[in-house]
Amino acid sequence: MMKYIFIALCFTAIVLASESDVAKASEKGLTVRGGDMLLDCIVAVLAQIVSGLLRVIIGLVITLSGVLEIVIGVVVLLVDVLAALALDLVKGSVTGICSDFLDFDYVTEYIEESLRSSSAQLLAGLVQALLALPLAVLVALVALTESIARSSCSIGLSECGLL
């Protein structure tokens, strides 16, 4: 809230500075268009707003990368499940023949462990994506308000001759 009050004060300083420049110039017999300075200030603020919006887009791209991580985790999990099902089918048909040569309990334990680790990776990706979106939006909003405040106050101070 204080930032918005600060921005309003800076714009007031810009308007007062442009009015005082017009008054000084009219005393000397010169004509100055005070609206040009205000227009320059508005253009500078709009440029800062665009840069803040670009930061929002960058945050959304980071969030989409988290979503892609989730999709890849789901695909890997499905491949692991299909491999486990295929192994169960093979195990059922070959158990009698190869029971002396292969230890199927070890193989099934390995598949179960890989499924657990894949599901853990999937949950980690989901949590990252869920946390990335609000965080990216908040960071972008903070950067946007700070850039607006910084640019408008720099312009206001330079118009007043304080910078």
Swiss-Prot record:
GO biological process entries: cell wall organization; sporulation resulting in formation of a cellular spore
Transmembrane stretches, start-end: none
Residues annotated as signal peptide: 1-20
UniProt keyword list: Cell wall biogenesis/degradation, Membrane, Signal, Sporulation
Subcellular location: Membrane
InterPro entries: HAP (IPR005566)
Primary site of residence: membrane
GO (cellular component) term, any one: membrane
Pfam families tied to this protein: HAP (PF03866)
Functional note: Might be involved in spherule cell wall formation.
Family the UniProt entry places it in: To HAP-P protein.
Protein name per Swiss-Prot or TrEMBL: Sporulation-specific hydrophobic abundant protein
Lineage: Eukaryota, Amoebozoa, Evosea, Eumycetozoa, Myxogastria
